[in-house]
């Protein structure tokens, strides 16, 4: 691929795996050849498995064991989820899961998921539709379709009481993480949740940053975000405390800001600001060909590639009352999970 002037990489989230190539349009067939070969006849061997196992084990140690705060989301996911697979990270719940991976496990997973019937192919750039159809038929047509994977994952039960975990770790500053369960990606509530996270923690103008970082100086940094999960995900508030600030003080301050949002409806101006910000993010994300291709693939996975051009209308339809109602729905103490990450003294 490099000799053809291109590059490739891949990533995996909790919901999908994305292999992607970038190369000159005149060499597009090289990408079809390589990706179809990967799907048709991936080379499985004990030697290659041992090599990749070692690489992933080192990645696990580097990012999740030896890195300060690296295990925060391992702990939070285990706290927040009881049955859904979101309860572990993509890389695995623990290092032993990677160390003990067997060749048959890898093969079975590959032939279950990496089949044409379960794949979405997006080609974006200076290409013609008929050219892409011809190349797809030539390179992927001969591969056995496989059996369609039906996503039937355990449904996480409604949380009925608050959960809390306190840990001591070798980190420079205390950290506070709190999550609440939110709606799935295609639910109407998803858009209200997305705007709520912007209101609370979307940058330096957000409520949490203005009050708890700039004004009260309880946190050195604080964010509010969600993961865009296909199934019901989490809204998270995540912050590092200023040295010397008591955890109880910081925790209470976050709760007070949440209660303000629940008690008093936001003004139209504040809502319009985060809607405009969301529109800008969507527009800028799709400026590059690679980002556009990834967006098309994701929306097709959601069921309709055309949503790429229409989804923003769902944000525009969210009103002040919707934000107020959704804040009161999810920011329930019984729906919360709190991780208090104490720096060892």
Predicted regions and their residues:
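An aromatic/glycine/proline-enriched structural segment found at the starts
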Residues: 82-83, 87, 115-184, 285, ...
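Mature hydrolase/peptidase catalytic cores and their serpin-fold inhibitory cores, especially
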Residues: 322-325
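Active/ligand-binding-proximal structured segments within catalytic/core domains
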Residues: 1, 188-200, 208-212
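M16 family metallopeptidases and their MPP-like homologs
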Residues: 1-39, 71-96, 118-124, 174-184, ...
């Amino acid at each position: 691929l490099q000799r053809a002037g291109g590059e490739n990489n891949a990533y995996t989230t909790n919901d999908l795996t994305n292999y992607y190539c970038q190369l000159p349009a005149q060499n597009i067939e090289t990408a079809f050849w390589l990706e179809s070969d990967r799907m048709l006849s991936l080379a499985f061997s004990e030697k290659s498995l041992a090599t990749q196992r070692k690489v992933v084990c080192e990645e696990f140690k580097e990012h999740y064991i030896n890195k300060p705060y690296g295990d925060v989301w391992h702990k939070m996911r285990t706290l927040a989820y009881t049955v859904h697979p979101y309860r572990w990270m993509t890389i695995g719940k623990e290092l032993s899961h990677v160390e003990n991976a067997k060749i048959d496990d890898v093969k079975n997973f590959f032939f279950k998921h990496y089949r044409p019937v379960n794949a979405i192919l997006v080609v974006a750039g200076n290409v013609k539709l008929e050219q892409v159809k011809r190349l797809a038929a030539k390179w992927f047509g001969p591969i056995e379709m496989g059996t369609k994977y039906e996503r039937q994952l355990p449904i996480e039960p409604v949380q009925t009481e608050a959960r809390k975990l306190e840990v001591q770790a070798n980190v420079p500053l205390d950290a506070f993480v709190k999550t609440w369960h939110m709606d799935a990606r295609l639910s109407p509530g998803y858009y209200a949740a997305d705007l709520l996270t912007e209101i609370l923690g979307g940058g330096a103008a957000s409520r949490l940053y203005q009050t708890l970082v700039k004004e009260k100086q309880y946190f050195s940094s604080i964010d509010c975000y969600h993961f865009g999960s296909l199934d019901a995900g989490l809204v998270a508030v995540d912050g590092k405390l200023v040295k010397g600030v008591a955890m109880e003080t910081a925790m209470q301050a976050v709760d007070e800001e949440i209660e303000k949002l629940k008690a008093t409806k936001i003004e139209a101006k504040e809502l319009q600001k985060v809607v405009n910000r969301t529109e800008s993010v969507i527009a800028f994300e799709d400026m590059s060909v690679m980002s556009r291709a990834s967006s098309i693939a994701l929306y097709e996975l959601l069921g309709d590639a055309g949503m790429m051009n229409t989804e923003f209308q769902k944000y525009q339809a969210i009103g002040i009352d919707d934000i107020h109602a959704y804040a009161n729905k999810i920011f329930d103490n019984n729906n919360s999970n709190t991780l208090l990450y104490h720096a060892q003294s």
